């Protein structure tokens, strides 16, 4: 924690101190500090508390009308005074999370070069591939423990944004701190600039990235490998989160590195963990098990297949065979249901094809099986959307599902809001209020026939901050599948619906600190059990989590000589 009563000794003074976001207090510098650090005359006379600063900042925030302007304003505070930024965000977490992350961050990525004001993190470009060690040494933060890295090729549902993708690592790490208590001094956002194939970015005179078609194949793999090795040399214990890599790279990179370094892919594993946790809560509330369900996915990319594999693992842990579990999962992409013998499937898709014996008696029109065909024949109880294609959960599809399932569970998870497969309002209306809905982006509660239905945001921010906190608390050397499974189970125990039989599927964001600590404990405990972290007692583990949990409060400063 940073509520340490001991003073912090600072070598900076004057404008240099005010220009250091991690240390700047602005108007909250005391009279003694202003004198010691040559700040007199550089600040207004009044010394304020952080709460007074928050009140002014919130008034200014409310004066902006558009979400983009609010995003830019918050980023400006972050780049000026990080302690104030995180206190403001924590005080208004439900209101501001959609601004600092999805859905607003999508537009911020698309307009990154146009709204750019100040650098944050590292931009590691392919032309500098022989100097990555030097670039890492230039990072503003020296004791880095968590890195979020992207190559900008698959930003949310928006595709290739080049270096504009940097908005995602910045936003994700903001949530590591705001939700998971990881000190911003330990975080580093990175974009690997390997070019872009987005013609709009290449033609934009404002675009600030490397103007070159994307590097691919062996050259790309060698570049990523050199980056990983350089990080290992500089920060050998750092957790690396891969973020928004394209499908063709996301799973291969995860498979290549997950047993070599401490890393995970949030799009694949984090999304899977929060989805499984939400489904476990829904099943508990309904008095059933996940292994009793039939599950259809729309979207068979790395994210969808990652969720499916996590669901299958949970089903198997409940006592059914792997083969039986796979027979209850139906993957649908643009070509229809994935079936054995289909050409051009990727390795991770091959493991999820339906066998002919399971579908030979199905009814359909034309070749293959559409989503509607699957609804009619498989009679799923759960429908999950990770397609990035808006509107594909049509009224006909949802009503067909509802025919065979009184309480359908429908998760349209695609981000941002413009890409959602169906709106909660439509799903609730089409099922006469009987569907249980969770989404990837935030939605207001739905009012149907006089009743209000809370819509859970099945957001990775419920999971990855706790994973990071747990890894840091015990200095875990790997992030294993079992650790991720424990994060899902811990999240499910926090569900108001599962606990009380009513309320929201997931806890309110105002309780995210408690959720993150609970997940951190479960993740760290499993890491110890699996031998990827040193063994400590439960009491010592709780203490380690509390000690690692950073709070946005100002510490006293004392000046030290250079």
From Swiss-Prot:
> What positions are marked as the site Important for activity?
267
Record-annotated active site: 101, 172
Q: Where does a divalent metal cation bind?
A: 243-244, 267
Q: Which reaction does it catalyse?
A: (S)-malate + NAD(+) = pyruvate + CO2 + NADH; oxaloacetate + H(+) = pyruvate + CO2
- The EC number(s) attached to this protein equal 1.1.1.38
Q: InterPro entries annotated for this entry? A: Aminoacid_DH-like_N_sf, Malic_enzyme_CS, Malic_N_dom, Malic_N_dom_sf, Malic_NAD-bd, Malic_OxRdtase, NAD(P)-bd_dom_sf, NAD_malic_enz_proteobac
| Gene3D superfamilies, sorted | Malic enzyme, N-terminal domain, NAD(P)-binding Rossmann-like Domain
Example GO molecular function term? Answer: NAD binding
According to the record's subunit comment, the protein's assembly and interactions are:
Homotetramer.
Q: This chain belongs to which protein, by name?
A: NAD-dependent malic enzyme
Instruction: Supply the source organism for this entry.
Output: Vibrio campbellii (strain ATCC BAA-1116)
